[in-house]
Amino acid sequence: MKNIKILSFLVGLAALFAACENNDNEGPVTPEPREQVGRTVLVYIVGDAGDSNELSDLFKINFSDMKAGMEEVDYSKCNLVVYSEMKNDLPHLISLKQKNGKVVADTLFTYAEQNPLDKEVMSKVIAQTVDYFPADSYGFVFLSHSSSWVSASNNANSRSIGYYRKTQMNIPDFREALFSAFPKPLKFILFDSCNMQSVEVAYELRDCAEYFIGSPTEIPGPGAPYKAVVPEMFTETNLAMNIAEAYYGYYEKLYTGVSPISNENWTGGIAT
């Protein structure tokens, strides 16, 4: 009997410590549609490249920075939803929301393994986001490798966005997914992905969004400084300029013009 009492005490103590653990990640939770707000932004992360171009580790840092950025917004007026596809993990749809004075990550859906660059998959994710997080306006952020319309000296036939296990998505398919699944043109698209700020891309997506924000060349490996960028995604006046300046300004402060640069110490600036 004495042994049983000791065991019961230890089990109870373990449960107490587990209950007191500070855990910023919740879920899966039973999703319930939220009341309509001013703006919902869907962040679409494609991290599993399947080769040496892997981006998942960098994107995990981006995700943490997004949580920090959400601390600076009025959650009653906005939603930040993240589709996360990373190496060695199943894809998830996650809501970053404020709860009890801090930002938590609620896992709404966990999917079976799927190609995030498939048109039907992307359309489904967008439709779920719209259904559960209706808003007056929408934004879309895309994180992955991309080639866009590259110069003829490289690959004249390349018109793609994203990179998942050596597969890519045709930009016309990307346009169709956005146009068919969102109920209205987006307020903005932020391409946190190389080479996507081109006339050809803007023309292809001309009926999908009001503003396009990106770089005509390569972007820094660490990507956008989301702690600064996320609050700007939910502004109204000078929206596109606010996002661009938050992105550019971060790297401008780090710029030294000295080589070499690295993802841990990116001092080479960013093209605009």
Regions found by a protein language model. Name each.
Residues 131, 155-191, 196-272:
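Terminal, contiguous helix-loop blocks that mediate binding/assembly
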Residues 3-6, 265:
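Intrinsic disorder/low-complexity segments enriched in polar/small residues
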Residues 25-141, 146, 150-178:
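Divalent cation-coordinating acidic motifs and surrounding scaffolds
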Residues 1, 13, 52-56, 267:
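Intrinsically disordered, low-complexity regions
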